């Protein structure tokens, strides 16, 4: 079980007038003067209270071969705590590591998140975890190969599947090293106004690829 508090302040620096329009500029332009987005742009404080439950049965934290790491997190951002607007973010995370032999591991992660209330635009990109808040759907920690923070909304669904093969163990200068080859598929989506459970598997943004990693011992 975990509990804590945090404080975040966000500022904006305007782009030069001759700069290319950003995605945010395009959204504001399409919303018009009566839209809700322009009112949430100036920046400010987002101070929060957080509680959660964590279940961790991994055999080791790095290079996990088997086990489960699941989280249920609730983050309240109340106005009485000094925030510019009040809202609640809840997040469900389930990570499972399935051994397929001594050197092969199937790793899966599912994240479902929703924001209830009027969160400012700059807070909608946050994906909360018990360890560290991440930013956005898109980028090396969510949808690999897609630009960071590319998709933003109140509701979020993400699924990562990765097959990892510990291909070789060797040593350099007396230090134990290993090489891991992997292939992955990442898929997910957002909803502007909140989760729609019946649409989890429609209009998905998908990326796939592979990689190579080198590790030292069992800790790095």
Enumerate the predicted regions with their spans.
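C-terminal transmembrane beta-barrel domains of outer membrane proteins
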Residues: 68-220
